[in-house]
Amino acid sequence: MIKVENLYKGFDGVPVLKNINVEYETGKCNMIIGASGSGKTVLLKNLIGLMTPDSGEISYGDMKMSQMTDKEKKLLRQKIGIIFKGSALFDFATVIENVMFPMEFFTDWSPAQRRERAQFCLEKVNVIGSDKKFPNELSGGMQKRVGIARAIALNPEYLFCDEPNSGLDPYTSILID
C-alpha cells in the first residue's frame, strides 16, 4: 500500500499540493484525475521520489520515504516502473539500450539476459525491428511505446503512468490499457 499523509509541495511560495491525504492499495488500478495544471504530475513525481515534499509523508508499506536510506530507496526504485508524458528516452542510446538502461542499475542480470528481456518488452508493445534505431528515427507514438517497454522491463510492483495514452493511436491505447 502507498499512503500519502498531509502532503504539501509548493514552488516560489505558491502551493501546488496542499494537505493531500490518500491511500493506494497494492494490486489496484488508481487514477489521479484533474484539470491541466492541477498538480497531478507534481504528485506523481513526489510519489516516485523525483521530488521531495515540503512537508507530509509518503509511505510504501511500513517504510516512510523520508526515513529511507539510499540503499532502501534503491530497492524501492527497483519496484517502480514509470511511463512519462513524453517518451523520456535518451537520444544518445539505441532503442534496445534505452529499454536495457534500468536493468543495468537495478539487476545483476548478464548483458545477454538484459538484452533478451528488453527484446521481450519491445515485442509486448509491438516495437519489432527497431532495436538498433535511435529515438529521433522513430515516430512520437513509437517513442512512447519504447518508453512503455522500459517501464515494464523490471516487471515492477508499482507502475506509475503520467498520461500513458498520449501520443498513441486508438488501437495501441486499448492494447496498453
Name these PLM-found stretches.
Residues 56-64:
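Conserved ABC transporter NBD signature motif
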Residues 153-157:
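A short, proline-enriched helix->beta-strand linker immediately N-terminal to the Walker B motif
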Residues 48:
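Helix-to-loop junction immediately C-terminal to a conserved catalytic motif
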Residues 134-138, 142:
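Conserved ABC ATPase signature
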Residues 170-172:
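Helix N-cap at the start of a conserved alpha-helix in ABC-type nucleotide-binding domains
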Residues 63-64, 111-130:
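Conserved ABC ATPase "signature" region
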Residues 159-162:
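Catalytic Walker B motif of ABC-type/P-loop ATPase nucleotide-binding domains
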